[in-house]
Amino acid sequence: MKKHKFYITCKHGKDIEVMQREGEILEYTAPNGTILQIGVAKDDTYGVYSLTEISTGCLIPVKGYKYKKLVLKQLTPDLLTQIVQALELARNKKVASVLKKYKDGRKIKNDM
């Protein structure tokens, strides 16, 4: 799959590199190694583009625009960092709940 690079310009510091795969998926690798996949979708009802984090299916809080370029310009380094942090928190909660269920299940079996 062919990837195209584009950069998000920061006011302070260097630009953030984001890869765009063929189609409408963007990939961003955070400094901690977390890979963020963002889907660009056009709403058929209103005819505007929106952004979605693919692994969770959550909409990214940006204003919908008729042009894809205007939606992508709203991706800032701060927003990407917040999305990565929220994604890590959601994953940690999910892992903790699975571990708790597993631990509770073993405890019940051992008591019998």
Question: Which residues fall in each region the model found?
Answer:
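Acidic, low-complexity, intrinsically disordered interaction modules
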Residues: 34-81
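Short intrinsically disordered terminal tails
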Residues: 1-4, 103-112
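Non-catalytic tandem-repeat scaffold regions and their flanking low-complexity/translocation tails
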Residues: 22-25, 39-41, 92-99, 104-105
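Acidic, low-complexity intrinsically disordered segments
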Residues: 79, 83, 87-91
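Negatively charged, low-complexity tracts enriched in Asp/Glu with abundant Ser/Thr
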Residues: 1-33
